[in-house]
């Protein structure tokens, strides 16, 4: 499941492997878990794991604010691949 893979990835990359308190609704920017530079790591992870094309127009903090918002982005892009743009 993408949600658990994302949580594990975020914990490994940004929290020294610590998942306590990290769930699908944790506000990643508000808690300084990720910053704007980390979005590109997350984009790469989502592209590899989900095989979706994420265009530049989709790369903004609202789509990466929580694990839940990233999963929703992937689901939307899978349902409407024309919205993704170039990979």
Swiss-Prot record:
Keyword Transmembrane part of the UniProt annotation: no
Modified residues (O-(pantetheine 4'-phosphoryl)serine): 36
Highest taxon listed in the record's lineage: Bacteria
Keywords of the record: Phosphopantetheine, Phosphoprotein
SUPFAM superfamilies referenced in this protein's UniProt entry, alphabetically: ACP-like
Carrier domain segment(s): 1-78
Known role: Involved in the biosynthesis of 4-methoxy-2,2'-bipyrrole-5-carbaldehyde (MBC), one of the terminal products involved in the biosynthesis of the red antibiotic prodigiosin (Pig). Carrier of the L-prolyl group transferred from L-prolyl-AMP by PigI.
Protein name according to UniProt: Probable acyl carrier protein PigG
Encoding gene per record: pigG
